[in-house]
Amino acid sequence: DGLSGDIWFFTIYLCICLRENATSPFFSSHPWAIWVLAVTAGIFHAKQAATADYYRQFHLYFLKGEEGSELDSSVVLRKKYDEMPWRGHFWSKLVLFFYSNYTANQEALSPAMQKLRAELQRVFKGGTASKAFRAEFRKGSLPLMKYTNILSFNWRSIALFVSILCKMPWLYFIFELVVLNGILVYMISRHEALCRRLTKELKAGKFQA
């Protein structure tokens, strides 16, 4: 869903740039400006959406288990990609290529979370985490879910529609760079701190039963 959303918003960004260069006196005189703004916002958009989606899936993993979550591993996905032949699987392999890179980007933005996943694998031997751990993680993660919602589709759409109604679509890029990036930094800081604490407690022998 996150990867599809990136493609969807790419078309929106493109349309905003074309519209502003055609109708705005400032951007008509400086056509490069809107493109620089759009590319910068787009880069951060991808990071915001990917991180929000990843945190949400990790939360669902401890709430509903594997069946209720789409939590993946780039290592596993890359192995599937390497083992899948191009012949007869062209589109599936192409999608897997982009999705494995998308997942790798999510993992790169959450180093403490990756250490926590590795420690969970070690402590619980690849099985289900203890009830005590799952409860403790959900307790710390739940307050952050409101930020994942803000960084998702609905709030972006509202900001986009407001900027269009104000006849200043470029304001959406400013909203993304200033407001959403601020939320992203805060959310990552909180989530990584949670993961570091739980990793330390797991190593100390807590949540074993």
Set out the residue ranges of the language-model regions.
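Multi-pass membrane catalytic core of lipid/isoprenoid biosynthesis enzymes
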Residues: 1-49, 160, 165
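C-terminal membrane-associated helical module and adjoining short loops/tails
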Residues: 44-45, 54-209
